[in-house]
Amino acid sequence: QWFDRDGDGYGDEPFGNEYDDCLDVFGTSIVDRLGCLDTDGDGRSDEGDALPNESSQWDDYDLDGFGDRIGGVMGDSCPTQYGNSTNGSLGCPDADGDGVYDVEDSWPNDIRIWSDGDGDGFADQSATNLSDDCPLVEGYSSIDRIGCLDSDSDGVSDEQDFYPNDAKRTEEQLIYQKT
């Protein structure tokens, strides 16, 4: 090479060694094209880099904006599926847009709720008709408090039930008997 008009160390002669693929741009790319702009310094030209501003990522097969290298910054947990999840597994399908991957979302079609840590079917998130009043305890009460321990399965939580082991007698029944 006898001439390098942009001064990046790659020559302008197309038939010479280490030909500059971007003749008029000072560039440092060395992987896919020589001498082209490489903003993030990962060795790949910006044109050949799906994420040109993140050096730990360069491929994005499904074009969702999350890099295919799971170990890199914002690594895609579902690299072959377009996805928008941002909470936990990144770049996976999230139908309701709450940020949680549908497979990990207890309610994949309700943006307000997504988890049930105690597995009782009531949501950990508050302010909905499915919100668990006792999110750390698996319970099935549904009358006075939602999702709390109900030993006799009468719908009244043990905490409010004068007879927590007798489904035929509850605090509510006692109140009605007194009136």
Language model regions located:
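Extracellular calcium-associated, cysteine-rich motifs in secreted modular proteins
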Residues: Q1-T179
